[in-house]
Every structure is written in structure tokens, then in C-alpha cells.
């Protein structure tokens, strides 16, 4: 599950996109960089074509590869129902004392967009990676994610918990 969350964040994917992936949708090279085919993406369905997300962070690819090695070819990467993912996600937010932050699975895409824009300072890059054709919509995702991040005040306990659990990624 952690590998899918990392992929969703890195690839600025919609929740349904990363939760419905199969191992057959992912191609990684020996350096753990690669491509994810989104056969059922929102815009892909409208346009009648497959959309793609690139994995250019080898740590994301390596974690995804470790999960996929345990799966038969073309098996769903998420082993279990989506409803179970949502429960575990919410339980994780509670364990990290982040329920007041109101994080939801769709926050993963927004956070990824904000991180990408702040890291690279290139709106066109973020729009391309997030697959937005509208600057207006991309800015909503970026600005909203950035505002949430800037307004967030984490307690010492939450920071310590996040640091502790980060070691398991």
C-alpha cells in the first residue's frame, strides 16, 4: 500500500488510478525508472486513449518493484478492496495524529502537484506530469496543496511519529 501511495504522490495520480493498477500496467528498467499505463483514467476515457505517467524517482520505482515481484503477472497491485485501503488510510492518519488536517486519499495528488511545482518551479512540467490541460485547474491543485501545507502545524508527537514510520518506507 505504501508503494501505491508513493506512486500516486510522485505521479500526481487520481486515487482510482493508482488503486486499480495491475502489475501489467507498470514497466520499470534496471534503474527502477519507468512508465505506468493508465488504461482507465478520467481523461483517457473521454479521449479514447491510454494516458501514461512516468516514474523518474528510482526510490519510488524500487519500492513498487519490490511489491510487484511478489505478484503474478497482471495481478492487481492493491491486494484487497478499495474500501479496506480507505480504512487503513484513515487509521494511518489517526495513528499519526493527523485527523485534524483532514487528509483524504485525493490529497495525495494535490500534495504531489504542490511538491513538484515547489521543487522544480516549472508550471508546464507540473501540468504535463499531472496531465492537466488547463492552467487554471493545475493552479487550483498546486495552490490548495501549498496553502494546506503552509497552514499545517504539526505537534512534536506527530513529527516524531512521521519520522519513525518514514524509516519503514
Annotate each language-model stretch with its function.
Residues 6, 107-133:
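C-terminal catalytic core of tyrosine-transesterase DNA break-rejoin enzymes
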Residues 1-15:
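Basic, Lys/Arg- and aromatic-enriched nucleic-acid-binding interface segment
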Residues 12, 38, 78, 89, ...:
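Mobile genetic element proteins and their domesticated derivatives, centered on retroelements
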Residues 20-63:
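Conserved tyrosine-mediated DNA breakage-rejoining catalytic core shared by Y-recombinases
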Residues 128, 139-169:
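DNA/chromatin major-groove-contacting recognition/catalytic segments
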Residues 1-2, 82, 86, 109-110:
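Short, leucine-enriched amphipathic alpha-helices that occur as contiguous helical runs
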Residues 54-100:
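Active-site/catalytic core of tyrosine-dependent DNA strand-transfer enzymes
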Residues 27-28, 102, 121-142:
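Short, polar N-cap/turn motifs at the start of nucleic acid-interacting alpha helices
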Amino acid at each position: 500500500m505504501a508503494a501505491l501511495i508513493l506512486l500516486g504522490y510522485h505521479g500526481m495520480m487520481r486515487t482510482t488510478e493508482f488503486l486499480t493498477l495491475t502489475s501489467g500496467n507498470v514497466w520499470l528498467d534496471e534503474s527502477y525508472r519507468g512508465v505506468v499505463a493508465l488504461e482507465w483514467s478520467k481523461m483517457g476515457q473521454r479521449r479514447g486513449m491510454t494516458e501514461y505517467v512516468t516514474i523518474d524517482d528510482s526510490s519510488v520505482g524500487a519500492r513498487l518493484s519490490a511489491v510487484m515481484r511478489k505478484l503474478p503477472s497482471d495481478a492487481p497491485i492493491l491486494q484487497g478492496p478499495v474500501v479496506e485501503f480507505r480504512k487503513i488510510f484513515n487509521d494511518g492518519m489517526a495513528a499519526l495524529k493527523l485527523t485534524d488536517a483532514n487528509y483524504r486519499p485525493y490529497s495525495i495528488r494535490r500534495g504531489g502537484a504542490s511538491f513538484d511545482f515547489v521543487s522544480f518551479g516549472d508550471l508546464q512540467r507540473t501540468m504535463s506530469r499531472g496531465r492537466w490541460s488547463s492552467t487554471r485547474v493545475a493552479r487550483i491543485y498546486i495552490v490548495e496543496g501549498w496553502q494546506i501545507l503552509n497552514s499545517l502545524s504539526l505537534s512534536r508527537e506527530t513529527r516524531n511519529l512521521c519520522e519513525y514510520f518514514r524509516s519503514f518506507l
